[in-house]
Every structure is written in C-alpha cells, then in structure tokens.
Regions:
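Short, small-residue-biased leader/transition segments that mark boundaries at the very start
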Residues: 1, 6-13
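Histidine-/acidic-rich catalytic cores in large beta-rich domains
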Residues: 11-200
Length: 200
C-alpha cells in the first residue's frame, strides 16, 4: 500500500494505486480488510468487490488522496464518523496502466500539470455501508504528496508539488497563502498553537 497506515481507534490505510481508503481489522494479529471507501469498478472482479462501501450522492471519487484523517463527533450516531483528506484529484496507477480513470471523472494524470485538487470531507456510516461528501472546496493542484489539516474551524492546505501552502477560514475563504521556491516539493504542512507543550 502507498503511504503509511494511520493509527486511529481502528486502522485505515490510504492507497494511491487504487485511490481507495481501506479499513483493516487486527492489523498486528491476523490483519483482514473490513471495508473499502473507493469506486466499485476499481475492485470489480477481485475478492474484495463486495467490501466496497456505497457512494451516496453525485460527486467524483477521491483520486490519489493523502493525509486521510479520522474524526469522531458526538453529534453522530453510533458507527458514523467523518473522514477528511487532501484529494489530489489524479487518476493514475503504475500497476494498472490500462485502467480508465477518466470514466470515474479523474481526468488528471500529471503530477504538476493539472487544474484543481480538493479538500474532501466524507461522512462514513459503517452500519449502512455508505459514504457521502459532506464538504469540499478547490485548492491549488498537486498530483502527489500534499496535506490537509482542520484546525479550530480553519483548514490548512499544502499543495506539495507547486510548493504552495495556505490557510482557509470556515467559509473556505483564503486567509493567507505562501509559495516556496523549492527544487522538489513540500511533503506536509501542519500548524501548531504550542498550547500544552512541555516548555510552557
């Protein structure tokens, strides 16, 4: 799988090659796939095709996503949670070069020469086996790397390939944006308030 497995109360992994988010049970003791958040057609004909959750609503699936973040909310029912990410909005797979990502609405295939990436926030319902797009907004395009961080109502975005990072308010209006002159890319950007750090 591409990228690290994120340590949540249950384990979820973000897989670039399939543009999927995979929940893994018993990660360190007989791991097994619990369910998949992705497009059904990617998994068609495999042993996992019946594990793909149903997409509710009309939206383009995430493509090449990074920094998936699990969020519990006391206002949600048991078995529901939020999941937000930097949606690179790229359709590419080195292991499946003939797969038609454009049929899913993922028309970008370049790390640099794309139009738009997105912040995506899903509502996942494990009981119903569904996921829906609860929030999204456009951000500068980056086909690879990048990050998203919700912070006190604002959102910090790193579009890693062009070296752009920015903060947006709760209405997705740009507060400030910075561009670094870099030879490669910015892997991640996080903002900290330093409250509760050991040196205070």
């Amino acid at each position: 799988l591409h990228k690290a497995i994120h340590s949540f109360p249950t384990r979820r992994s973000s897989d670039l090659e399939t543009s999927s988010i995979i929940k893994i049970d018993s990660l360190y003791d007989g791991p097994s796939v619990s369910y998949i958040i992705g497009d059904q057609s990617v998994w068609e004909g495999t042993e996992y095709e019946n594990l793909v959750f149903t997409r509710q609503g009309d939206f383009t699936i995430q493509g090449g996503q990074h920094t998936i973040t699990y969020v519990e909310d006391p206002g949600l029912a048991e078995g529901q949670y939020y999941l937000y990410m930097f949606n690179n909005n790229i359709g590419i797979s080195e292991t499946r070069p003939d797969f038609d990502w454009s049929a899913l609405g993922l028309t970008e295939s370049s790390a640099e020469d794309g139009d738009t990436s997105y912040y995506y926030k899903y509502l996942v319902d494990e009981n119903a086996g569904t996921f829906s797009l609860e929030d999204s907004f456009e951000v500068p395009y980056s086909g690879y790397v990048s990050s998203a961080q919700d912070l006190g109502g604002n959102t910090v975005i790193d579009s890693g390939i062009p070296g752009i990072f920015a903060e947006y308010d709760k209405d997705h209006e740009l507060i400030a944006q910075y561009t670094m002159d870099t030879e490669k890319f910015i892997y991640r950007v996080y903002k900290y308030d330093f409250q509760g750090f050991y040196f205070q």
